[in-house]
From Swiss-Prot:
Entry EC number(s): 2.1.1.222, 2.1.1.64
Gene that encodes it: ubiG
Gene Ontology MF: a single term: 2-polyprenyl-6-hydroxyphenol methylase activity
An example Gene Ontology biological process: methylation
Family: Belongs to the methyltransferase superfamily. UbiG/COQ3 family.
Binding annotation for S-adenosyl-L-methionine: 41, 72, 93, 136
Designated name of the protein: Ubiquinone biosynthesis O-methyltransferase
S-adenosyl-L-methionine as UniProt keyword: yes
Coiled coil: none
Keywords associated with the record: Methyltransferase, S-adenosyl-L-methionine, Transferase, Ubiquinone biosynthesis
Protein backbone atom coordinates (compact mmCIF):
# COMPACT_ATOMS: atom_id res chain seq x y z
CA UNK A 1 0.00 0.00 0.00
CA UNK A 2 1.38 3.42 -0.92
CA UNK A 3 1.98 5.88 1.90
CA UNK A 4 -0.56 8.22 0.33
CA UNK A 5 -3.22 5.50 0.63
CA UNK A 6 -2.39 4.58 4.22
CA UNK A 7 -4.55 5.69 7.11
CA UNK A 8 -3.96 5.81 10.84
CA UNK A 9 -7.70 5.69 11.54
CA UNK A 10 -9.46 2.71 13.08
CA UNK A 11 -13.07 3.75 12.50
CA UNK A 12 -14.41 1.42 15.20
CA UNK A 13 -12.23 3.24 17.74
CA UNK A 14 -13.35 6.65 16.49
CA UNK A 15 -16.98 5.54 16.78
CA UNK A 16 -16.41 4.16 20.29
CA UNK A 17 -15.03 7.44 21.61
CA UNK A 18 -17.54 9.54 19.66
CA UNK A 19 -20.35 7.67 21.42
CA UNK A 20 -18.92 8.74 24.79
CA UNK A 21 -18.05 12.31 23.78
CA UNK A 22 -20.56 13.99 26.10
CA UNK A 23 -18.77 12.50 29.12
CA UNK A 24 -15.28 13.87 28.48
CA UNK A 25 -15.45 16.61 31.10
CA UNK A 26 -17.27 14.63 33.81
CA UNK A 27 -14.73 13.77 36.54
CA UNK A 28 -16.96 10.90 37.67
CA UNK A 29 -17.92 9.65 34.20
CA UNK A 30 -16.40 7.21 31.73
CA UNK A 31 -13.20 9.25 31.47
CA UNK A 32 -12.62 9.42 35.22
CA UNK A 33 -9.26 7.56 34.90
CA UNK A 34 -7.93 10.27 32.56
CA UNK A 35 -8.99 13.00 34.99
CA UNK A 36 -7.02 11.16 37.70
CA UNK A 37 -4.08 10.66 35.32
CA UNK A 38 -3.86 14.30 34.26
CA UNK A 39 -1.77 15.71 37.16
CA UNK A 40 1.12 13.26 36.77
CA UNK A 41 1.29 13.52 32.99
CA UNK A 42 1.01 17.33 33.02
CA UNK A 43 3.88 17.56 35.51
CA UNK A 44 5.94 15.20 33.35
CA UNK A 45 5.25 17.26 30.24
CA UNK A 46 6.02 20.57 31.96
CA UNK A 47 9.20 19.47 33.71
CA UNK A 48 10.81 17.81 30.69
CA UNK A 49 9.77 20.62 28.34
CA UNK A 50 11.25 23.20 30.68
CA UNK A 51 14.49 21.23 30.94
CA UNK A 52 14.71 20.89 27.15
CA UNK A 53 13.79 24.46 26.24
CA UNK A 54 15.47 26.20 29.19
CA UNK A 55 12.30 27.34 30.95
CA UNK A 56 11.39 27.81 34.62
CA UNK A 57 8.84 25.13 35.62
CA UNK A 58 7.68 27.32 38.50
CA UNK A 59 6.66 30.22 36.26
CA UNK A 60 2.99 30.84 35.56
CA UNK A 61 3.36 30.21 31.81
CA UNK A 62 6.41 27.97 31.41
CA UNK A 63 5.54 26.89 27.86
CA UNK A 64 5.05 30.43 26.52
CA UNK A 65 5.85 30.66 22.82
CA UNK A 66 6.01 26.92 22.17
CA UNK A 67 3.77 25.36 19.53
CA UNK A 68 2.21 22.10 20.74
CA UNK A 69 0.18 19.41 18.99
CA UNK A 70 -2.13 17.26 21.12
CA UNK A 71 -2.89 14.46 18.66
CA UNK A 72 -5.98 12.40 19.46
CA UNK A 73 -7.01 15.13 21.90
CA UNK A 74 -10.49 13.77 22.58
CA UNK A 75 -12.45 16.29 24.61
CA UNK A 76 -9.39 18.40 25.39
CA UNK A 77 -8.51 17.20 28.89
CA UNK A 78 -4.82 17.71 28.13
CA UNK A 79 -5.04 20.49 25.54
CA UNK A 80 -6.63 23.05 27.86
CA UNK A 81 -4.16 22.88 30.78
CA UNK A 82 -1.21 22.83 28.37
CA UNK A 83 -2.60 25.98 26.73
CA UNK A 84 -2.86 27.58 30.17
CA UNK A 85 0.86 26.95 30.57
CA UNK A 86 1.33 29.43 27.73
CA UNK A 87 1.69 27.06 24.78
CA UNK A 88 0.02 27.64 21.42
CA UNK A 89 -1.94 24.37 21.24
CA UNK A 90 -3.49 22.59 18.28
CA UNK A 91 -5.86 19.88 19.49
CA UNK A 92 -6.49 17.34 16.73
CA UNK A 93 -8.93 14.43 16.70
CA UNK A 94 -10.67 12.54 13.87
CA UNK A 95 -13.98 12.61 15.76
CA UNK A 96 -16.19 15.59 14.95
CA UNK A 97 -18.14 14.92 18.16
CA UNK A 98 -15.02 15.01 20.31
CA UNK A 99 -13.89 18.26 18.69
CA UNK A 100 -17.35 19.75 19.19
CA UNK A 101 -17.28 18.96 22.91
CA UNK A 102 -13.69 20.20 23.23
CA UNK A 103 -14.42 23.47 21.40
CA UNK A 104 -17.53 24.18 23.47
CA UNK A 105 -15.69 23.58 26.73
CA UNK A 106 -12.70 25.69 25.69
CA UNK A 107 -14.97 28.57 24.74
CA UNK A 108 -16.70 28.42 28.12
CA UNK A 109 -13.43 28.17 30.06
CA UNK A 110 -11.52 30.70 28.00
CA UNK A 111 -8.76 28.26 27.04
CA UNK A 112 -7.16 29.36 23.74
CA UNK A 113 -6.95 26.00 21.92
CA UNK A 114 -7.09 25.61 18.14
CA UNK A 115 -9.24 22.49 17.79
CA UNK A 116 -9.40 20.68 14.46
CA UNK A 117 -11.24 17.54 13.31
CA UNK A 118 -8.29 16.18 11.33
CA UNK A 119 -5.95 13.18 11.25
CA UNK A 120 -2.22 13.08 11.88
CA UNK A 121 -1.55 12.41 8.22
CA UNK A 122 -3.64 15.42 7.16
CA UNK A 123 -1.61 17.69 9.44
CA UNK A 124 1.68 16.24 8.22
CA UNK A 125 0.65 16.56 4.57
CA UNK A 126 -0.19 20.22 5.23
CA UNK A 127 3.39 20.78 6.43
CA UNK A 128 2.48 21.50 10.06
CA UNK A 129 5.39 21.43 12.52
CA UNK A 130 5.56 21.72 16.30
CA UNK A 131 8.00 22.18 19.15
CA UNK A 132 6.15 19.46 21.08
CA UNK A 133 3.92 16.62 19.91
CA UNK A 134 1.79 15.02 22.62
CA UNK A 135 0.91 11.45 21.68
CA UNK A 136 -0.86 10.46 24.88
CA UNK A 137 -3.03 7.35 25.24
CA UNK A 138 -3.53 7.20 21.47
CA UNK A 139 -1.24 4.59 19.88
CA UNK A 140 -3.28 1.69 21.25
CA UNK A 141 -6.30 2.97 19.31
CA UNK A 142 -4.87 3.54 15.81
CA UNK A 143 -4.97 1.27 12.76
CA UNK A 144 -1.24 1.32 11.92
CA UNK A 145 1.04 2.09 14.86
CA UNK A 146 4.28 2.39 12.90
CA UNK A 147 2.79 4.68 10.24
CA UNK A 148 1.08 6.78 12.92
CA UNK A 149 4.31 7.24 14.87
CA UNK A 150 6.43 8.12 11.83
CA UNK A 151 3.73 10.53 10.65
CA UNK A 152 3.73 12.28 14.04
CA UNK A 153 7.53 12.26 14.17
CA UNK A 154 7.75 14.17 10.89
CA UNK A 155 5.96 17.09 12.59
CA UNK A 156 8.55 17.44 15.38
CA UNK A 157 10.80 20.43 14.74
CA UNK A 158 14.60 20.29 15.18
CA UNK A 159 15.25 20.39 18.92
CA UNK A 160 11.63 19.45 19.56
CA UNK A 161 10.03 16.73 21.65
CA UNK A 162 7.48 13.96 21.30
CA UNK A 163 5.81 12.46 24.35
CA UNK A 164 4.17 9.04 24.07
CA UNK A 165 2.00 7.47 26.79
CA UNK A 166 0.33 4.09 26.43
CA UNK A 167 -0.11 0.60 27.91
CA UNK A 168 2.45 -2.17 27.54
CA UNK A 169 1.52 -5.48 25.91
CA UNK A 170 2.23 -7.77 28.85
CA UNK A 171 0.17 -10.28 30.81
CA UNK A 172 0.44 -7.95 33.80
CA UNK A 173 -1.15 -5.17 31.74
CA UNK A 174 -3.85 -7.55 30.49
CA UNK A 175 -4.69 -8.44 34.09
CA UNK A 176 -4.61 -4.91 35.52
CA UNK A 177 -5.33 -2.44 32.71
CA UNK A 178 -7.95 -4.54 30.93
CA UNK A 179 -9.50 -7.26 33.11
CA UNK A 180 -9.40 -5.43 36.44
CA UNK A 181 -9.95 -1.88 35.15
CA UNK A 182 -12.77 -2.75 32.74
CA UNK A 183 -14.43 -5.83 34.25
CA UNK A 184 -13.85 -5.72 38.00
CA UNK A 185 -13.38 -2.08 39.03
CA UNK A 186 -15.40 -0.77 36.06
CA UNK A 187 -13.10 2.24 35.73
CA UNK A 188 -13.44 2.04 31.96
CA UNK A 189 -16.19 0.74 29.66
CA UNK A 190 -15.63 -2.84 28.55
CA UNK A 191 -13.80 -3.00 25.24
CA UNK A 192 -11.89 0.27 25.74
CA UNK A 193 -8.64 -1.62 25.25
CA UNK A 194 -7.84 -4.79 23.31
CA UNK A 195 -4.76 -6.77 24.33
CA UNK A 196 -3.53 -7.32 20.79
CA UNK A 197 -3.52 -3.54 20.17
CA UNK A 198 -1.37 -2.71 23.19
CA UNK A 199 2.13 -1.52 22.29
CA UNK A 200 5.50 -2.48 23.72
CA UNK A 201 8.13 0.25 24.26
CA UNK A 202 10.46 -1.13 21.59
CA UNK A 203 7.61 -0.97 19.05
CA UNK A 204 7.46 2.77 19.67
CA UNK A 205 11.18 3.42 19.90
CA UNK A 206 12.08 1.73 16.60
CA UNK A 207 9.90 3.83 14.23
CA UNK A 208 10.77 7.03 16.08
CA UNK A 209 14.48 6.27 15.77
CA UNK A 210 14.01 5.55 12.06
CA UNK A 211 12.68 9.10 11.66
CA UNK A 212 15.54 10.69 13.59
CA UNK A 213 14.14 10.92 17.13
CA UNK A 214 16.20 9.75 20.10
CA UNK A 215 14.54 8.38 23.25
CA UNK A 216 15.80 10.54 26.12
CA UNK A 217 13.52 9.46 28.98
CA UNK A 218 11.38 6.50 29.98
CA UNK A 219 9.10 6.01 32.97
CA UNK A 220 6.39 3.73 34.21
CA UNK A 221 3.22 5.09 35.78
CA UNK A 222 1.13 3.33 38.42
CA UNK A 223 -2.06 4.03 40.33
CA UNK A 224 -1.93 4.03 44.14
CA UNK A 225 -5.37 3.20 45.64
CA UNK A 226 -4.20 4.41 49.05
CA UNK A 227 -3.22 7.83 47.69
CA UNK A 228 -5.95 7.81 45.03
CA UNK A 229 -3.48 9.16 42.51
CA UNK A 230 -1.07 8.17 39.75
CA UNK A 231 2.68 8.24 40.38
CA UNK A 232 5.82 7.76 38.30
CA UNK A 233 7.54 4.40 38.65
CA UNK A 234 10.48 2.35 37.33
CA UNK A 235 7.99 -0.41 36.45
CA UNK A 236 6.94 -0.06 32.80
CA UNK A 237 5.03 -3.35 32.63
CA UNK A 238 1.60 -1.67 32.54
CA UNK A 239 1.32 2.09 31.92
CA UNK A 240 4.39 3.93 30.69
CA UNK A 241 5.58 7.17 29.07
CA UNK A 242 8.43 7.75 26.64
CA UNK A 243 10.07 11.03 25.66
CA UNK A 244 11.83 11.43 22.32
CA UNK A 245 13.83 14.35 20.91
CA UNK A 246 14.90 15.43 17.46
CA UNK A 247 18.43 16.81 17.38
CA UNK A 248 18.56 20.58 16.98
Amino acid sequence: MSEAAKSTIDQSEVDRFSAMAAEWWSPTGKFKPLHKFNPVRLAYIRDHACENFGRDPKSARPLEGLRVLDIGCGGGLLSEPVARMGASVVGADPSEKNIGIASTHAKASGAPVDYRAVTAEQLAEAGETFDIVLNMEVVEHVADVEFFLTTCAKMVRPGGLMYVATINRTMKAAALAIFAAENVLRWLPRGTHQYEKLVRPEEIEKPLAADGLDIIARTGVFYSPLQDRWNLSKDMDVNYMLLAKRAG
